[in-house]
Amino acid sequence: MSSTVSAPAQIQLSQRFRGVRSRTLAICKPLTPEDMMVQSCPEASPAKWHLAHTAWFFESFILRDFLPGYRLFNEDFPWLFNSYYRSFTEFPEKRLRASFSRPGLDDILRYRSYVDEGIERLLEVNPDPEALRRIELGANHEEQHQELLLTDILHAFYTNPLRPIYRPFDSNQDMRSASAEPLRFIHFNGGLIDVGFSDSGFCYDNELPRHRVWLEPYALADRLITNREYAEFIADGGYRKSELWLSAGWDVIEQNGWRAPLYWNAEGESWTLYTLRGETSLEEAADAPVSHITYFEADAFARWAGKRLPTEFEWEAAAETQPVSGNLLDAEFLTPAPTSAASNSGDQLRQLWGDCWEWTSSAYLGYPGFAPLEGSLGEYNGKFMSGQMVLRGGSCVTPQPHIRSSYRNFFQPETRWQFSGIRLADKVTPLTGGASK
């Protein structure tokens, strides 16, 4: 065993571990066992699988390596609940996850309890610091799956003709709000800046190493684009004007017949929007941020508006000094909130955190000197650095402890089952009018 770890650090990590594991179960509480078997699109996974896979991660990368005498809960589970770690073991195709009715939900819950007990025993014996680092990684991994759970539940319920409601609004909650204020642009001077993780806590390998980049002066919209503004793009024929679209994006919308964001349904001359809180009208949600759009749709809207999407480094430079606070999972609103609910903070950007992941124009690539984790954990991020775009800022279903200014989410540009939206950017001339940072 290497150098010891302080008791307070172990206690703090134990509390964090229990909190994360409890929240995952709380997310599943409104579901029936039948709900937890559904896999409604190729990108999604059944809720039952998420419960098992997150336990598998702790068992496979922590308990097997660091808890003396640990015995697997089930010899078949390492294969059955592996996601994509090819150097670890073989695994079933993702599309087959809903095909396995066994093990049943009760067995999965027993598996989780068994793993929980193992982690707690490990924390009691003052583990190797590497074990603590992996437990923190496992907690962050599970927080990612909490978000995926909710986006997968939303899609599963949307495909059900009965349109179930995951969680109705409380009596003091709704989507109605005053009209959003006109879009304003906040100017930033750019220059030579440092980007990447700089703190002493946890981060993913794709946030490192910290390095310098050059930014020309730029401006960012003070808030996200609303449903009302996106509806204007639709009404103006945005989905019929090929000149607004990247070639691959035009192919995607034509092949799929897309003429609006996911979860929008035409009702005569208006629209309804389906959410985790149930169905609502466009009129009611007009000033909430538009969500569930692809990178291609975000890019086409920006071109239609005469603007562009920000780079990931423009976003990070603007967000680095801003405290993490907003419509995140901890707020339990579970859908992008009306823009007027975000406080008007003068020359500060609003809605940086939560509501919707913000598409950037940056391809997902390794930073100069990027080094993946050793062993099978090196497959966590690095092997996906091809054909994906970076998103920043978190969403309404991102746990608040999970997000930070250097956090890099990434998805294929045709992906839209996540809470993904738009913040516009623009170029500026140095020393022009308006706020500068």
Regions found by a protein language model. Name each.
Residues 2-23, 27-45, 49-118, 132-147, ...:
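Disulfide-stabilized, aromatic/cysteine-rich ligand-recognition loop
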Residues 67-70, 74-75, 126-132, 246, ...:
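Short, structured coil/loop segments at alpha-helix boundaries
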Residues 91-95, 124, 184-186:
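A short, terminal or domain-edge coil/loop segment
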Residues 122-133, 155-164:
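Inter-helical turn/loop segments and adjacent helix faces that build the functional surface
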Residues 138, 142-144, 148, 152, ...:
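Functional-site microenvironments in short loops/helix caps that host divalent-cation chemistry
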